[in-house]
């Protein structure tokens, strides 16, 4: 393709070059389950609606068929059932009151905390990275940094042997 020297625009009769944008890799079933669990926890944290109704609604959501439904159910139900225990685990690492966290950050911390405590087959770095990615996607501009810091400190406490072996 030749550009006209005066304008830098494509010469008459030529087509502009097609843009080649890198296509994002498909989301894993576990990533989708985490996204849906975060959305469910967000709804629950805001309204305290019946978790069964929220879960049923999300099971019917577009794209749920591509999620790991067992992992989703475990994350959503486990985080709600153990909210007080999980919050008590990460609360010492907060620089503010739990009530001052955004609902997205709080939901991401609950998902990440649940996985750190109960999903020991998932490496702690993966758990933290997934929570960070959730916060980047659904949260505020800098929230992911906060979630990263809190979960990193929690991982050192609840998975001390794994963290020590990797550092």
UniProtKB/Swiss-Prot annotation:
Residues 1-32 are annotated as: Disordered. One of its GO terms (cellular component) is cytosol. Keywords: RNA-binding, Transcription, Transcription antitermination, Transcription regulation. InterPro entries: NusB-like_sf (IPR035926), NusB_fam (IPR011605), NusB_RsmB_TIM44 (IPR006027). GO terms for molecular function: RNA binding. Belongs to the NusB family. NCBIfam families: nusB (TIGR01951). Involved in transcription antitermination. Required for transcription of ribosomal RNA (rRNA) genes. Binds specifically to the boxA antiterminator sequence of the ribosomal RNA (rrn) operons. This is Transcription antitermination protein NusB. It comes from Cupriavidus pinatubonensis (strain JMP 134 / LMG 1197) (Cupriavidus necator (strain JMP 134)). The lineage of its organism: Bacteria, Pseudomonadati, Pseudomonadota, Betaproteobacteria, Burkholderiales.
């Amino acid at each position: 393709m030749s550009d006209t020297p005066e304008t830098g625009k494509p010469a008459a009769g030529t087509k502009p070059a097609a843009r080649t944008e890198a296509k994002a890799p498909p989301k894993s079933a576990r990533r989708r389950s985490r996204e849906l669990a975060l959305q469910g926890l967000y709804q629950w944290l805001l309204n305290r609606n019946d978790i069964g109704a929220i879960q049923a609604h999300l099971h019917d959501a577009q794209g749920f068929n591509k999620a790991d439904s067992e992992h989703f159910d475990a994350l959503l139900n486990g985080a709600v059932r153990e909210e007080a225990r999980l919050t008590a685990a990460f609360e010492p690492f907060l620089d503010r009151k739990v009530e001052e966290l955004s609902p997205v950050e709080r939901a991401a911390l609950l998902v990440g905390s649940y996985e750190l405590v109960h999903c020991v087959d998932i490496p702690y770095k993966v758990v933290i990275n997934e929570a960070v990615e959730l916060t980047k996607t659904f949260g505020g501009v800098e929230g992911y940094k906060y979630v990263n810091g809190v979960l990193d400190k929690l991982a050192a406490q609840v998975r001390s042997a794994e963290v020590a072996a990797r550092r």
